[in-house]
Amino acid sequence: MARWAPGASERLRQAALELFAENGFDATTVAEIARRAGVTERTFYRYFADKREVLFAGEEQLEQVFTTAVTTAPANAPLSRLVAAALEAGGRELQDRRGRDYARARDAVITANEQLQERELLKMAKLSRALTSAFVARGSAPMAARLAGELAVSVFGTAFARWIAPGETRDLVELQRDGLAVIAELTHTGSTVETDSPVRG
């Protein structure tokens, strides 16, 4: 087996998802993943720290896509526009990088394993904190930035769940826009109120 086989990273991902679905995450070994992908275990560890990271590799890059959209938005953009820009960029990156079928298969594996669910929640919390910091860096008050960060992650998570639902054909970006429209309707305003009051809790 070649140590640096072309497309090894993608083959390892696909092999892992297949085996997780067939045997369960806990019962699947790195050796089995490598064997199905046609590479050595050493090659596996060149790409991933462990089998869990097959499911979570790339989260830092995705987080950076979200935050870069905030930092590069027009100087006079209101906080509501920064939220929309982050969601647009992050949602498009996710759906273009892996696609709906991969996302569905990955979600099924995570849903079946409590530890993986906890890891996914930590990832989303980290994204919220990163967005909050990016909003503050753009001049938003701390409380408004924190609420906006949590709102963005909530809209993203809700849209993602709809995107991978059986029979859904709309793209993730469109579903995120739907979510933002619902938020605007619920609050009866399209703008974000900012305050200099300190964050509590």
Feature names for model-found ranges:
Residues 1-23, 27-39:
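Basic, helix-initiating cap at the start of DNA-binding domains
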